[in-house]
Amino acid sequence: MRNPKLKTLLAPTLLGLAIFAGTAQAAAPLRPPQGYFAPVDKFKTGDKSEGCDAMPTPYTGPLQFRSKYEGSDKARATLNVQSEKAFRDTTKDITTLERGTAKRVMQFMRDGRPEQLDCTLNWLTAWAKADALMSKDFNHTGKSMRKWALGSMASSYIRLKFSDSHPLAQHQQEAQVIEAWFSKMADQVVSDWDNLPLEKTNNHSYWAAWSVMATSVATNRRDLFDWAVKEYKVGVNQVDADGFLPNELKRQQRALAYHNYALPPLAMIASFAQVNGVDLRQENNGALKRLGDRVLAGVKDPDQFEKKNGKEQDMTDLKQDMKFAWLEPFCTLYTCSPDVIEKKHGMQPFKTFRLGGDLTKVYDPSHEKGNKGS
C-alpha cells in the first residue's frame, strides 16, 4: 500500500475486523458433524407403524446400583453373575428409555411417521418433568448410569434438533422442557466427574465427557463444550508412547476390551470439537490415532496386550461388530488404511444406542445398508 496515511487509517479497522471475526467464531452456535443435518428419508403414512411401547417409569429414586464386578479385586475384571442380574433388573427402565429413544429416532429418520416422533418426545418429556436421574444419592455405578443415559438421549436428540427436515419446529414446548433437563443433568455429570485424580480417570470419565459434549451441542452451551474438551485432553494425555492406557491395562484379561471401550467417546468428542473449530487430533502427538492403531493391532494379535500386562486377553466383547462403532468418526478424523476401511465396511452399519443410534448413517451414509455377507 503506497499511501501511508491510508494505511494508518485502515490499520485499526483491520484489527477491529480481526477481533470481530474471532468473537463471531467464538459466538457461533455449536453444531454437530454434517451427517446430523440429514433430512428424514421419507414421510410415510398409513397403519404400518410399530406403535408406541409402554413408557418406562421415570427413575427418580437413589442412583445406588450394584456393580457387575461386585466382589472382584482392584482390577474390576471378573464378572459377578448375580450382581450383574441385580444391576440389569434395577436399571431396566433407564436402559429401556435409552434403547427406545435411539430406536424410535432411527425409525423416524427413516420413515417420518409423526407417531414415532410423538412417542419419543412424550417419553423424554415425561422423564424431564419427573426430574428423573437427578438424585444426589448415588454410588459409582449410579453416577455411571446417569452419564451413559444422558449421552444416549442427547446424541439421539441431536438428530432431531439439527435435521434439515426440522421435525421439532412444531414441538418447541417439549424441546424446551427436554433441553432444560439435559442441561441440568449435564451440570450434575460435570459435578460427578470433574477433577478426579489421574489414577481414577479412566473410560468412565471419557464417557462422561461425551455425554456433556453431546449435551453442549443439544443446548448450545459453550461452558459444557469447554469442559468436554478439557476432559478429552486429560484422557488422551494418559495414552503412552506405545498407544496404551495405563489405567485400562490394570483391567487384566479385559485390558484390550477396555482400551477399545475407551475409544468411542474420545473419537466422538474429537469429531464434534473439529466441526466447532477445535482440532484435537494432534493432542499428545496424535494420541487418539495411536490408541486406535494399538487396539486394532491388539485385535489382530492380542499377545501384544498379554506381553504388556501378563494376562491372556478375553476377546468375547471384541467379537461384536458394534463395539467398533468408533471407526466411523475415527476414519473421518484420520486417514484410515485400506485394510481398516475394509474391516469397517465389513462391519457396517454401526448402530449403538450409547452414541445415539446409527453412526454409519451419520458418518458414512453411502454404506448405511451395510456390506455384511457381500
Curated annotation (Swiss-Prot):
One of its GO terms (molecular function) is poly(beta-D-mannuronate) lyase activity. It comes from the Bacteria. Keywords: Lyase, Periplasm, Signal. GO terms for cellular component: periplasmic space. InterPro entries: Alginate_lyase, Alginate_lyase_dom, Chondroitin_lyas. Its EC number is 4.2.2.3. This is Alginate lyase.
